[in-house]
Regions:
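Conserved donor NDP-sugar-binding/catalytic core segment of glycosyltransferases
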Residues: 1-11
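A short, conserved alpha-helix in the catalytic core of glycosyltransferases
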Residues: 44-46, 50-55, 60-87
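Juxtamembrane C-terminal module of membrane proteins
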Residues: 132, 151, 159-210
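Active-site-adjacent helix/loop segment of glycosyltransferases
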Residues: 80, 86-159
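Residue-level signal for pocket-adjacent positions within structured domains
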Residues: 6, 21-24, 33-34, 52, ...
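A recurrent flexible, glycine/aromatic-enriched loop bordering the glycosyltransferase active site
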Residues: 25-46, 61-62, 68, 110, ...
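Short, flexible active-site-adjacent loop segments at beta-strand->alpha-helix junctions, enriched
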Residues: 1-2, 21-23, 42-43, 86
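Short, flexible helix-coil linker/hinge segments at the edges of structured domains or between repeats
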Residues: 11-26
Length: 210
């Protein structure tokens, strides 16, 4: 974590990036669940062979493109190596509302990839993080931060659940909940221009010209 990182976020970084190195594969799915695919492109390196075999990152992604890539790589027989000795300074100082926005996008990304995330549990890791973070704050004698932890965790959970059900929400509400507004604009444009050949006429389809 960065020097200005708060105690709650500091523990979250340590929780996600532990001190022990490991190698993960699909064989770990039952044991690790969602953590099997945990992979952050903030501090990652890819071999060209693997990147090209998987087909690179998806062209349009709201969030989680790194975990989607990791899951697809594992399905092709690759493994993920986590090197605990590698160092990258990275952390966030999000407020509760920003946590809601971020986790809304997380929920959307999982809903858009049921072939990857439907079979694994995410909420179990979330509950474990809150429980261990509480113990950490007690040990640090910073009990006054526990209410903040609960508020932030609640916002994460609400955002995540809303993201998972985003197809049932009106677009106006989605735009208030998302952190990545550009994604929705790009997706709408992609859907609106689907089937149009830009090299035909003035960018209209053959059916429209008829």
């Amino acid at each position: 974590p960065n020097e200005d990182c708060g105690e709650i976020e500091k523990f979250t970084r340590d929780f996600n990036y532990p001190a022990e190195s490991c190698i993960k594969s699909l064989a770990d799915l039952e044991r690790l669940q969602i953590k099997t695919y945990f992979f952050s492109n903030v501090c990652a390196a890819y071999t060209r062979e693997c990147y090209e075999a998987v087909g690179g990152f998806e062209s349009l992604a709201i969030f989680n493109e790194d975990m989607v890539f990791a899951a697809n790589a594992m399905k092709k027989g690759y493994k993920i190596a986590y090197a605990a000795e590698a160092k990258v300074f990275h952390s966030h100082n999000y407020n509760a509302l920003q946590q809601l926005h971020r986790n809304f996008d997380l929920g959307v990304s999982q809903a858009e990839h049921p072939e990857i995330f439907e079979a694994v549990s995410s909420t179990g890791e979330g509950k474990k993080l809150v429980r261990l973070n509480c113990a950490y704050l007690k040990k640090k004698k910073k009990l006054y931060l526990i209410p903040k932890l609960f508020v932030h965790s609640g916002c994460k959970f609400i955002g995540y659940k809303l993201g998972k059900m985003h197809r049932k929400l009106p677009e106006s509400l989605i735009m208030k909940l998302t952190m990545n507004k550009a994604y929705w604009a790009q997706r709408n444009f992609k859907n609106a221009t689907k089937g149009i050949n830009p090299h035909s006429g003035y960018g209209i389809s053959s059916d429209e010209r008829k």
